């Protein structure tokens, strides 16, 4: 059986949630060889130790705390985790067996359960975020030309090929993880919040020929600490951050890798329609005080994103497609 070690990124702000996660890891039927906690520099290390976990200080950032060489780990696989999930006792063992059976490079747990949203929430997600359900099972999550995604509507318990995935928990073959060079995506950490970091990372594996899959109903609980995302959602600048991140991410992962000029035009039209639609919705919502500045900030974000894609810094980033 493939061996694995655990890599957790954290700021240490939710120690009890982290404790619950560590307890569930130490209780696994197949034990991890190591549990490495990548703690952002300048943040206090939790005072407790559940078992044999080790702490490594790294630069702060959603991407930076994943874009490490993992020199501390010699296992076949790395279980990448946020600090707010917990597992049933045989969860990791089952996913390792899935990885061996399907010869996958990465299997991510479905932690956000889009398919379980209420009908009202599904309609809202489709209208506001262009995120909609799909009724075939070809892909767990499919990325579209406008950089939005669709999700399988009724997966049941199973494991499906995917173009993207949720970021809180994923089992990677170490060779595939290192080959993705997440350090090339550190531009995301320069935003107020690394909006869409999981999408840019998982889709990169898919676009570069890796086999990504998503496991549904395989014994994971999302404890949802929201230490970083909570700050983002409370920020008045979130609309600007979202627009800027979406613009850069679309340009990097959709537009630039497209060799066909006709397809590039269609992708541009698709993305432009999405952004104009979102702007129109924000304009209607701006009658509320909390959304008063949203349209202006959204436009500023698009402009900032377009400006960045023309910068020398952006042009110096290695290509998204690496082969």
What positions do the PLM features span?
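Short aromatic/hydrophobic "clamp" motif used to bind/position activated sugar donors
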Residues: 78
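Short, well-formed alpha-helical segments that are part of the catalytic scaffolds
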Residues: 8-27
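A recurrent flexible, glycine/aromatic-enriched loop bordering the glycosyltransferase active site
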Residues: 139-172, 193-194, 229
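Conserved donor NDP-sugar-binding/catalytic core segment of glycosyltransferases
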Residues: 92-135
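Conserved nucleotide-sugar donor-binding
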Residues: 75, 166-181
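Glycine-rich, basic loop-to-helix element that forms the pyrophosphate-binding segment
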Residues: 57-73
